Amino acid sequence: GVGLAAGLSFANQKLNDGNISVAIFGDGATSRGIVHECMNLASVWSLPLLFFCENNLYGMSASSSRMISTDSIYKRATEYNMVNFQIDGNDIKQVIETVKKARSIILKEKRPVFIEALTYRQCGHSKSDHLVYRSREEEAYWKAKDPILQYCKSENITLETLNELTKKIEEFGQKELESA
């Protein structure tokens, strides 16, 4: 969690090892005290910490707009004196570039950074979640914005090549699991 990442970033700072820590959490977590406590602490202590919020528009089975008082989660970081970004979390290239930029800021300016990646949860929150709170039109819209398919299209990677890569990754994962 976020608290663990903050602790690790404190260790990174004390060791002066040039590493940063990354806290990855969903939009629902931004309403929890631990996130704000860690954002404050990271800012006060200038911790090498990247806060990466995956805003998938839903907290459990309710729209984020019903659970969060703002439509711009990333702007909350301004109050903690952090550089902050809101990005298209379905654009793999933009995510990579923004994370690289954030890492550079963290190391050069000695301050934490906050990224809000706007994305979509394709599946339910759990196995018992049947997604009755979402429209089929909404799901179709976001399915067309699938990050892997978008990336493959931008890089001219065919579906056949993607399927081959997926198979190799699954085989590798299975071998690793069996040898563990």
Model regions and ranges:
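Glycine-rich ThDP/TPP pyrophosphate-binding loop and its adjacent helix/strand module
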Residues: V2-E178
